[in-house]
Regions:
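Two-component/phosphorelay signaling modules centered on CheY-like receiver
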Residues: 12-36
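The feature encodes the CheY-like receiver
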Residues: 70, 96
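Conserved acidic carboxylate
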Residues: 9
Length: 118
């Protein structure tokens, strides 16, 4: 069974890059789902078993969450997923504590700094 990954990133170029990095970093048993906004990400998570992941047949194992999105903030999603059994990684342009510490408090397991060249 493929490991499911959700990538929430509103910038199509950055999202494509993250997809490529995930594919190249892991085996070919990866199934990547892409979302460009919070609404779509929430819908994909519901399909995989809801915010707890307990009822899903195959929940996401890794979720990459952009902090700044057109329809909200990625920390909103992190707060909703505190019981979800996936590793949650924040992707952001900002390396300061004002952005990273709150994300970690909301349930992020780590962060990945993005370049601003996208």
């Amino acid at each position: 069974m493929a490991v499911k990954v959700l990538i929430l990133e509103d910038n199509p170029v950055a999202r494509s890059f993250l997809c490529r990095v995930v594919r190249e970093s892991f085996s070919d048993t990866i199934a990547i789902t892409e979302a460009g906004d919070l609404e779509n990400a929430r819908a994909q998570i519901r399909l995989a078993g809801g915010s707890s992941g307990l009822h899903g047949v195959d929940p996401f194992k890794l979720i990459l969450v952009d902090l700044e999105l057109p329809d909200g903030n990625g920390m909103e999603l992190l707060a909703e997923l505190t019981q979800y059994p996936a590793t949650k990684i924040v992707t952001t342009l900002y390396s300061d504590d004002d952005h990273l510490f709150p994300a970690l408090q909301c349930g992020a397991d780590g962060y990945l700094l993005k370049e601003d060249r996208f």
